[in-house]
Amino acid sequence: MTVPQLAFVFPGQGSQSIGMLAGLAEAHAVVRESFEEASQGAGVDLWALAQQGPEEQLNQTEFTQPALLAAGIAVWRAWQAAGGAQPALLAGHSLGEYAALVAAGAMSLEDGARLVRLRGRLMQDAAPAGTGAMAAVLGAEDALVEEVCREASQDGIVVPANHNSPGQIVIGGHAAAVERALALLGERGVRKAVKLAVSVPSHTPLMREAANRLDEAMANVAWNEPAIPVVQNVDAQVHEGVQAIRDALVRQLYLPVQWTGCVQALATAGATRIGECGPGKVLSGLARRIDKGLDARALGTPGDFEAALGAWAG
């Protein structure tokens, strides 16, 4: 039964860890089955990688992406198998948008895993090690961050890449430009701005060529109309039609993730409950920060999963 007040969100890179979903897999066979299906598309044993590592490989973006896609769909299918309420809307953060579209039936898990492994490889190739950087900026107004990025982009590019919640923005671009932006932010009194352990500046213009090649690869995917609307990152809108959905996915790679807007769009559409489909609790935490009235819960452990099943049964 579809519940208008319920929306599900799928996390992106940063939520992976060795041993993720091990407990849920013991209780729900479909978790491991989902990883096995995704492995067919990715061409690598994703369950073994997620459980045993090596961690260095799991954290390489071309492997992180299919592993997290598998994890998101594993939790989604476990929820379906357990008879959980059907959400009225879906969204995913960056890579998580692909999981949302797989969950909605827009593409198969196997196709999705193949596509996001390629996406990761293209992203790595677009910014050789040491050329790109990203940093989290906390407690600063959007307008200030945007102004500083413009000032720091005199030689090289730095732009806002993720609008994660009010007062939490990730910037990205050429490494030297990111360093200049951090220095300027410090001069403007911003005390919490830290570089991230990420070398690929996703959601910045440096990914434009990768996006073009990703667009070409999308022609090899069998697309369907989503059975559940998906709010997409580029503009926090639901797009109608396969071509419009594809275009939004391509643009997502070089434009900022409007995550604050996505969560606000879910709430405006009537969502009061948000379930995080995947490992970790990043998105449920952001959702509560964006809208304190939301009942946002993680679903990635047996305890959290069962608690949400019980709380959202009616």
Residue ranges of each PLM-predicted region?
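Alpha/beta catalytic cores of group-transfer enzymes, especially the acyltransferase/condensing modules
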Residues: 13-15, 40-42, 104-255
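NAD(P)-dependent dehydrogenase/reductase Rossmann-like domain
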Residues: 177-178, 217, 302-303, 307-314
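A short, well-structured juxtamembrane/interface segment
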Residues: 257-265
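FabD-like malonyl-/acyl-CoA
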Residues: 1-145, 196, 273-307
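Non-catalytic positions within long, well-ordered alpha-helices that form the structural scaffold/packing
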Residues: 80, 186, 264-270
